[in-house]
Design a protein with these regions (language model features):
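Extracytoplasmic "Venus flytrap"
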Residues: 31-55, 79-85, 108-109, 181-190, ...
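Extracytoplasmic ligand/sensor domains, especially the bilobed periplasmic-binding protein
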Residues: 50, 101-207, 258-284
């Protein structure tokens, strides 16, 4: 009986947090846990934090969010999750229960977004993930209807990659063997699982398949083994520090497979700055359209504010998600989280990507593997 009572109290507490009255509020408190240190810091400081800072500045420069007929400024609270899932969960709990934030931004990375998902759901906060890729997105969107998955599924990326590799094989430019490595984190686990099936179904053979722990600095043994496998194609589902190391250490080892597909980081501005001509032809996830005036204007603003360009994959999608959140809040007219979630589920939004309407809490049309873009 006591157990049922405690559960009921917990449910009531979550409901109260979700619908707490905010009449006459003089600020909107937004909080987030983000990887300022640890192996995820590179991705967070390139793709995520600049978008948060730029969007908040732009909204506050207008006087704030339009709520109840007046502009209400945003106040930000942040914690360093240290690239640790347990720390991220504790920080998000603290933001909700102690700091009493009105809204939450998501952390960086697939693993951390999966870790904090139950907390966002428990308290009824919208979770717009734009640095998480998983084939579980459709299932999670049903389990956590407050969650929104902006980067697509692993299968979508693998289907695109397999299509390209199949054409190259048909044209006689590559053989059937693939060497694959993957980081032992949510991103690498999910994508490598989808890749094994996709490659096998398309008649390719994995001549080498190895995972490595997050934080691994010396990847030269894996490069050597991939090189000795004789595979024409090398695929790495890597995080930014690994992507940089793989590019550098492959050059040292004179490893130049006919196709090199690397993970997160290839689209970072520092990648081309660091590797120059050696970056030509390296493939990765995502892409960027030169012909989209809105994303070009976004990139210019990003460069002016941070003295560097945005990530050519998740940044534009992340900024679009913040524009969607802003429009949803202003349409609802108050910080009513259930109503904001409903608007995100059903509304159509004007963003740097163009008009966006989510399907089953997922963005469907903005992901594909691509040759490293030039803007």
């Amino acid at each position: 009986m006591m157990r049922l009572t405690l559960r009921a109290l917990a449910a009531l507490a979550a409901a109260a947090l979700a619908t707490a009255p905010v009449a006459a509020q003089d600020k909107v408190k937004i909080g987030y846990a983000i990887s300022k240190t640890g192996p995820n810091a590179g991705g967070a400081t390139i793709t995520q934090i600049p978008n948060y800072e730029m969007w908040v500045k732009e909204v506050n420069d207008k006087g704030g969010l339009m709520i109840g007929g007046k502009r209400v400024p945003i106040e930000v609270m942040e914690y360093d999750d240290r690239s640790n899932s347990e720390e991220a969960v504790r920080a998000v709990e603290r933001l909700v229960t102690q700091d009493k934030v009105d809204l939450l931004f998501p952390p960086w990375g697939t693993g951390l977004n999966l870790a904090v998902g139950p907390v966002f759901n428990k308290y009824g906060y919208p979770q717009l993930t734009f640095s998480a890729v998983t084939d579980r997105a459709p299932e999670l969107a049903k389990r956590w209807p407050n969650s929104f998955w902006m980067l697509g599924t692993s299968k979508q990326y693998i289907d695109g990659l397999v299509g390209l590799l199949t054409k190259l094989r048909t044209d006689g430019k590559i053989g059937p063997n693939i060497a694959m490595i993957s980081i032992a984190d949510g991103f690498g686990i999910d994508l490598s699982q989808a890749a094994r099936k996709g490659f096998t179904d398309a008649g390719f053979k994995l001549a080498y398949d190895k995972s490595y722990p997050i934080g691994t600095q010396d990847l030269s043994p894996l490069i050597g083994e991939a090189q000795r496998s004789g595979a024409d194609t090398f695929v790495a589902f890597s995080y930014p520090p690994d992507t940089m190391a793989l590019t550098e250490q492959s050059k040292v080892a004179s490893y130049a497979p006919k196709v090199m597909f690397l993970g997160v980081g290839v689209g970072f501005p520092m990648y081309t700055q660091r590797f120059g001509a050696n970056a030509e032809g390296i493939m990765s996830l995502g892409g960027w359209s030169k012909d989209n005036a809105s994303t070009a204007a976004y990139a210019k603003k990003h460069e002016e504010m941070f003295k560097r360009g945005p990530d050519r994959w998740g940044s534009q999608i992340g900024y679009a998600s913040l524009q969607m959140l802003e429009q949803a809040i202003e349409r609802v007219g108050k910080i009513d989280r259930p109503a904001i979630i409903k608007e995100l589920q059903t509304g159509t939004f004007d963003t740097v990507l163009g008009k966006v309407k989510l399907v089953d809490n997922q963005m469907q049309d903005h992901c594909c593997p691509a040759i490293l873009p030039r803007v």
